[in-house]
């Protein structure tokens, strides 16, 4: 079972439906016991960093102890960072060293919304069957700054920013696989296969 952690954000139905489409059994939950027993965990997207991290901190001992694959989507990926500057400066989970910052005005329209391409920067099982140049769907005003060693894909929006990161059992995407058509479903299927191992 894959636990989709409910920390008060939107988009829970679309990610659970997409995972079910690729054969996963899912449970949307904030119950620490269910999360502890899951074979994979998803931190979904769409919401504010501050309120999400406050809710996660209530079950921090449980999520810090997880050794199963964890997928962070959009806000979920940003929560992996050391800190975020969204609405102030807030400590993140610090699973992937980095800082979440707002796009500079020089990029043009913020939020970055719509389809954009991936540039794969290193091999990663989560991206099996996905090629550079394929389109995925974004909705965000903030992005993670992190070392290249953790970056598996980048995307250009006036600046090159990390659109995919990976460290140990933590995998994060700034885009929404559940809204990214066949490419997104392939990525979610890869995650399910990683979880099954």
Swiss-Prot record:
What GO annotations for molecular function exist for this entry?
glutaminase activity; imidazoleglycerol-phosphate synthase activity; lyase activity
Which Gene Ontology terms describe the biological processes this protein takes part in?
L-histidine biosynthetic process
Which gene codes for it? hisH
- Name of the protein: Imidazole glycerol phosphate synthase subunit HisH
Which PANTHER family would you find in this protein's record? IMIDAZOLE GLYCEROL PHOSPHATE SYNTHASE SUBUNIT HISH
Q: Which NCBIfam families match?
A: IMP_synth_hisH (TIGR01855)
Q: Which residues form the signal peptide?
A: none
Pfam families referenced in this protein's UniProt entry, alphabetically: GATase
According to its UniProt record, in which pathway does this protein act? Amino-acid biosynthesis; L-histidine biosynthesis; L-histidine from 5-phospho-alpha-D-ribose 1-diphosphate: step 5/9
Task: State its location(s).
Answer: Cytoplasm
EC number of this enzyme: 4.3.2.10, 3.5.1.2
Q: How does it assemble?
A: Heterodimer of HisH and HisF.
Q: Which UniProt keywords apply?
A: Amino-acid biosynthesis, Cytoplasm, Glutamine amidotransferase, Histidine biosynthesis, Hydrolase, Lyase
Give the principal location in a single coarse category: cytoplasm
Q: Report which superkingdom the organism of origin falls in.
A: Archaea
Using the record's annotation, list all stretches that form the Glutamine amidotransferase type-1 domain.
Answer: 1-197
- Report the protein's function: IGPS catalyzes the conversion of PRFAR and glutamine to IGP, AICAR and glutamate. The HisH subunit catalyzes the hydrolysis of glutamine to glutamate and ammonia as part of the synthesis of IGP and AICAR. The resulting ammonia molecule is channeled to the active site of HisF.
Q: State any GO CC term.
A: cytoplasm
InterPro entries reported for this sequence: Class_I_gatase-like, GATASE, Imidazole-glycPsynth_HisH
| Residues forming the catalytic site | 74, 176, 178
Q: Which reaction does it catalyse?
A: 5-[(5-phospho-1-deoxy-D-ribulos-1-ylimino)methylamino]-1-(5-phospho-beta-D-ribosyl)imidazole-4-carboxamide + L-glutamine = D-erythro-1-(imidazol-4-yl)glycerol 3-phosphate + 5-amino-1-(5-phospho-beta-D-ribosyl)imidazole-4-carboxamide + L-glutamate + H(+); L-glutamine + H2O = L-glutamate + NH4(+)
């Amino acid at each position: 079972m894959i636990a989709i952690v409910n920390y008060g954000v939107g988009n829970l139905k679309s990610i659970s439906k997409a995972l079910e489409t690729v054969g996963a059994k899912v449970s949307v939950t904030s119950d620490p016991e269910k999360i502890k027993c899951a074979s994979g965990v998803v931190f979904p997207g769409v919401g504010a960093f501050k309120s999400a991290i406050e809710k996660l901190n209530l079950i921090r001992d449980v999520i810090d102890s997880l050794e199963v694959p964890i997928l962070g989507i959009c806000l979920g990926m940003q929560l992996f960072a050391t800190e975020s500057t969204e609405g102030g400066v807030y400590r993140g989970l610090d699973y992937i060293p980095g800082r979440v910052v707002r796009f500079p005005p020089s990029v043009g329209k913020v939020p970055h919304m719509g389809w954009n391409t991936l540039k794969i920067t290193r091999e990663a099982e989560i991206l099996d069957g996905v090629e550079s140049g394929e389109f995925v769907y974004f909705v965000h005003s903030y992005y993670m700054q992190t070392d290249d060693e953790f970056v598996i894909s980048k995307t250009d929006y006036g600046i090159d920013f990390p659109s995919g990161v990976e460290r140990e059992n933590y995998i994060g995407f700034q885009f929404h696989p559940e809204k990214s058509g066949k490419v997104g479903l392939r990525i979610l299927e890869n995650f399910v296969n990683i979880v099954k191992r």
